[in-house]
C-alpha cells in the first residue's frame, strides 16, 4: 500500500492478487444484473512522492503494458458473463504520456468503450495553446476528443466522454455545460456523461439549446 499527498491508498498494479480482487467485484456486479463493468482509477499512482514507491513481486510486463494486460485479463473473465467492459481514462492521456500507464491506443484493444474525463478545469494554462482551457470548455473538450479520435483510429472501442458539470477554478454556467455537449456532438461520439461529485446537475443542460444560440464549441480543431 502506498499513500499519496491526500492520504489516498494505492495498491500494486503489478500484483495479480489485486487484479483478481477487482475483477471478482466486476463478476459479482455482472451476476447481479449490471450490463457494463466500468473500471475507474485503472492506472499507476500519482500526486505524491512516487520516487519512493517500490513494487515488490513479479513484473510480468513493463509499466506501459501493465494496465492493458489487466484490461485484457478482465475482458477474458467478464465477457462470458455477457457484459460490456470499459475504462475511465484521464482526459490528457491521448495527448501526452502522463507516466501513469494509461495508453488509449493499447487499452482500447480490449474494451468496448473508453470514458475520457475531459474536465477543462483540470487542464493547465497553455494546454492546446489555450491561455486558459477552463475559460473555453467547449474548445478544450473539442481538442481532447480530437486527440482521442486519433489515438483510437481503427479501434472498435467507443469514445464516451465524461463532461464537467461542476465548478472548479470558476463558476460553471449552463452555457459552459452546453458548450461541452455541443463539442461532443460535433465529433459524433457514442454519447457523453456528466459528472458532479455531489450529484447536483445543471438544470436544463440536457435540453436542446435555442436555435439562435452560438458557442465557442463551434470551433473544431484542425490538423
Label the predicted regions.
Residues 1-31:
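Active-site-adjacent "subsite" loops/lids of carbohydrate-active enzymes
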Residues 111-125, 133-217, 221-223:
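Substrate-binding cleft of secreted/luminal carbohydrate-active enzymes
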Residues 1-12, 45-64:
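Aromatic- and acidic-residue-enriched carbohydrate-binding clefts of CAZyme catalytic domains
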Residues 24-39, 43-45, 113, 117, ...:
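Alpha/beta enzyme core
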Residues 16-19, 23, 91-100, 139-142, ...:
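Active-site glycine- and acidic-residue-rich loops that bind
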Residues 30-31, 107, 185:
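Non-catalytic positions within long, well-ordered alpha-helices that form the structural scaffold/packing
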Residues 38-39, 45, 62-100, 155-167:
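Aromatic-lined carbohydrate-recognition surfaces of secreted/lumenal glycan-active proteins
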